[in-house]
Amino acid sequence: MSEATTTLDGWYCLHDLRSIDWAAWKTLSSDERGQAVSEFLNVVEKWNDVAAAKKGSHAMYTVVGQKADIMLMILRPTMEELNEIETELNKTTLAEYMVPAYSYVSVVELSNYLPADEDPYQNPQILARLYPELPKANHICFYPMDKRRQGDDNWYMLPMEERKKMMYSHSKIGRQYAGKVRQVISGSVGFDDFEWGVTLFADDILQFKKLIYEMRFDEVSARYGEFGTFFVGNILPDEKVEKFLHI
């Protein structure tokens, strides 16, 4: 039996993607739509207060393509808080004109390869990655993924040292994009349909394509990677929500 990798776990994460029922939204009067937008922004302001207190973080993006219209990424210390946020949002008037498109539940995760005598939760760099302040980058790319476990290509049957070696090589590619792409990895084994969620942030959207394409040639992806649906979008600042929903 292969040895399991020890992971470090941070904030719980919810990716909530919704489509707008524009036809139904149009039936409201201008005043009714305005009230619905104000109510939604009041909820977002609560999230801003939490972020300011460094007790969580969030990101809001519009989605390009027909898969969804809006993507919310929420980070919180407990799964209960994610549930409360989702429920509060569902009770708003705006939610009556939203159609659930996709969701993903996970927890921010790092593999722990530090020496046994070092407490990773005392390392400021690790804490910043486990409890991140999500960047206000122009663009987002999110996708879930698995490690293949079929026949001879079974990631989970490989020895620990071999997995470490391959992941080190894999991570070297990612480090070449430092300053261009910010990455948040979240684990979802037992939480959702895939094993990990990968969220990328960048001001130059082409960096997503370059990074992911280059990684395709690395053995970790080429031989062992299996990927779900990709979602890509543009940042939606609070002050532009009203314009986005304007009819």
From Swiss-Prot:
Fe-coproporphyrin III binds at residues 129, 143-147, 170, 183, 221. The keyword Chloroplast does not apply. NCBIfam families: PRK12276.1. GO terms for molecular function: heme binding; metal ion binding; oxidoreductase activity, acting on the CH-CH group of donors, oxygen as acceptor; peroxidase activity. Keywords: Heme, Heme biosynthesis, Iron, Metal-binding, Oxidoreductase. It is an enzyme of class 1 (oxidoreductase). Belongs to the ChdC family. Type 1 subfamily. It catalyses: Fe-coproporphyrin III + 2 H2O2 + 2 H(+) = heme b + 2 CO2 + 4 H2O; Fe-coproporphyrin III + H2O2 + H(+) = harderoheme III + CO2 + 2 H2O; harderoheme III + H2O2 + H(+) = heme b + CO2 + 2 H2O. This is Coproheme decarboxylase. Its EC number is 1.3.98.5. Fe-coproporphyrin III acts both as a substrate and a redox cofactor. Involved in coproporphyrin-dependent heme b biosynthesis. Catalyzes the decarboxylation of Fe-coproporphyrin III (coproheme) to heme b (protoheme IX), the last step of the pathway. The reaction occurs in a stepwise manner with a three-propionate intermediate. The gene is chdC. Its cofactor is Fe-coproporphyrin III. GO terms for biological process: heme B biosynthetic process. Pathway: Porphyrin-containing compound metabolism; protoheme biosynthesis. It comes from Bacillus cereus (strain AH820). The active site is at 143.
